[in-house]
Amino acid sequence: MADEKVLYEVKDKIAWITLNRPESLNAVNRDMVKSIVEFCHSAEEDHNVQIVIFKGNGERAFSVGGDIKDRARQNAAAAEQSESRLVQRQSKYSAIPGTPAPVIAAMNKITMALVHGYCVGTGLLMSLACDIRIAAEGARLGVSEVRLGFMAGSGGTQRLPRLIGIPKALEICLSGELYDAAECHRIGLVNQVVPYPDLVAAGEKMAGAFLKGAPLALRYIKEAIYKGSEMSLEQGLRYESDLQSMVMQTEDAKEGPRAFVEKRPANWKGR
């Protein structure tokens, strides 16, 4: 297991996806992207999983981003091939994306990133695709692609302004600078900042609070907030009402009040 670059573990309804390449500051190469995507699909299909948490091994970084050496090798290999423009364009949208961010963002389960040290490039894109971000004190986050000659993709220029507003998102993306955890918390990029030794415990604590809720309610709350934010208020209210009506028809919607009256923890069935 020590040789695996991405680790996967399910415990207490939480799926842990861990970047395990500390010697390279968890730089994400193509094989790792493939593994992360596969684990995301596994978690999404597992009825015993309600929350997915991403973290990085090693004390120095959640992830410094994509593996630049790996990218250079891919570029060199591509240059040796005389592909047509159509083939080149099709390859950009292959089954294995450049980052796992689009797959993470598409998950119905609640997702969380526990970031520490460097969280840059692909590392930041992964965390932006999550619902919750908790940072360790001293963490440094940024979008560095512009300094490598290209721009952030996989939602980097789209999710960031939706989280923190256009002016600050422009500053972060255009400068390529790194921002410390305290500043990221101030501007709303991360939900909490905790001491590094407490990072995993903080994630478990928040996940535990979420797990007290009914699984389908969690899912539809997430859907209502994300999809509703792209609608007018009137449309969003109608959408919220439709989802609420669906939730009220579930077994869990009957179990919750019953457990409250009987003064016991609810026994959620997820249906």
Can you describe what each PLM-predicted range is?
Residues 1-55, 72-73:
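Conserved CoA-thioester-binding segment of acyl-CoA-metabolizing enzymes
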Residues 3, 258-271:
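Terminal low-complexity tails and localization/encapsulation signals of metabolic enzymes
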Residues 32-35, 96, 199, 240:
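Hydrophobic alpha-helical membrane-association signature
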Residues 22-25, 60, 65, 138-140, ...:
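A short, glycine- and basic residue-enriched loop/turn
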Residues 56-103, 149, 232:
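Glycine- (often His-adjacent) and acidic-residue-rich active-site loop
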Residues 102-218, 235, 242, 246-250, ...:
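Crotonase-fold acyl-CoA enzyme core
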Residues 17, 21, 35-36, 54, ...:
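Terminal peptide-recognition signature
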Residues 28, 91, 114-115:
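Structural motif
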